[in-house]
Design a protein with these regions (language model features):
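C-terminal catalytic histidine-bearing segment of alpha/beta-hydrolase fold enzymes
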Residues: 176-220
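Short alpha-helix in the alpha/beta-hydrolase fold that links the catalytic acid
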Residues: 31-36, 150, 174-184
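Alpha/beta-hydrolase-fold catalytic nucleophile elbow
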Residues: 51-52, 113, 137-140, 165, ...
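Primarily recognizes the serine-hydrolase "nucleophile elbow" in alpha/beta-hydrolase
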Residues: 101, 106-157
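Conserved alpha/beta-hydrolase "nucleophile elbow" surrounding the catalytic nucleophile
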Residues: 22-24, 110-115, 167
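Short beta-strand/loop motif that positions the catalytic acidic residue
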Residues: 164-166, 170
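Short, proline-enriched alpha-helix->beta-strand connector loops that line the catalytic pocket
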Residues: 157-162, 188-190
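Serine-hydrolase catalytic machinery in alpha/beta-hydrolase-like enzymes
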Residues: 1-108
Length: 220
């Protein structure tokens, strides 16, 4: 699956890459303003990648076609999951990461991040990627295909830093689902940096500040 990717660099010869996956119904432009608020100049020039999800029918929305990383089959997002669609997106994200490595950015200097559906795919991809990444950042999402993670997870990323953030009033991905995801990762030994905020299914200024500090740490 070939994806259109919006690319932005803060300077020539970037020293790290941050790959950010948008949520259901959005596109890559959605998180460009957030990235612009992340001053990582102390690390050096950064390349940001914002891929656009393919437009597919989404079952929970009556089959209406919209940008989505995978199909949502029902209101309970973990009861029935579109494993085929998730695996296809995982392959596409692997290809994007591998392309960055070919462009001269070591895997240890690459962060994969995402919001909502994008969070799910960032976790799915990053935890299974065969080379050690700098970190995984998940916003307002959940751990997909959790039952397969123990068998499929990458030994190289067994201790990869994970940033998870969620709104306490999220009506799209309820907070208990995010807490269950956090606890599942912690039980497997991942170092999870957990944050919750008084907000709905969105991003807030305090969260962006926490993302900034975490990125400075994992990319230092």
């Amino acid at each position: 699956m070939s994806l259109e990717v919006i690319e932005a660099q803060t300077g020539e010869q970037p020293v790290a890459t941050v790959l950010i996956l948008h949520g259901l119904g959005a596109d890559g432009r959605d998180f460009v303003p957030v990235a612009e608020q992340l001053d990582l100049s102390s690390i050096g020039p950064i390349r940001f990648l914002f891929p656009n999800a393919p437009v597919i029918p989404v079952s929970i929305n009556g089959g209406y076609q919209m940008p989505a990383w995978y199909d949502i089959l029902g209101a309970d997002i973990t009861a029935r999951q579109d494993e085929k669609g998730m695996r296809q997106t995982q392959d596409s994200m692997n290809q994007l990461i591998e392309r960055e490595i070919e462009r001269g950015i070591p895997a240890r200097r690459i962060v994969i991040a995402g919001f909502s559906q994008g969070c799910a795919m960032a976790l799915m991809t990053g935890l299974r990627f065969p080379e050690r990444l700098a970190g995984i950042m998940g916003l307002s999402g959940y751990l997909p295909l959790a039952a397969t993670l123990a068998a499929e997870r990458s030994p190289a990323n067994a201790d990869v830093p994970v940033f998870l953030a969620h709104g306490t009033r999220d009506g799209v991905v309820p907070l208990p689902r995010a807490i269950a995801s956090r606890d599942a990762l912690t039980a497997l030994g991942y170092p999870v940096d957990w944050h919750s905020y008084e907000m709905e299914h969105s991003v807030c200024a305090e969260e962006i500040a926490d993302m900034h500090q975490w990125l400075l740490r994992v990319l230092a």
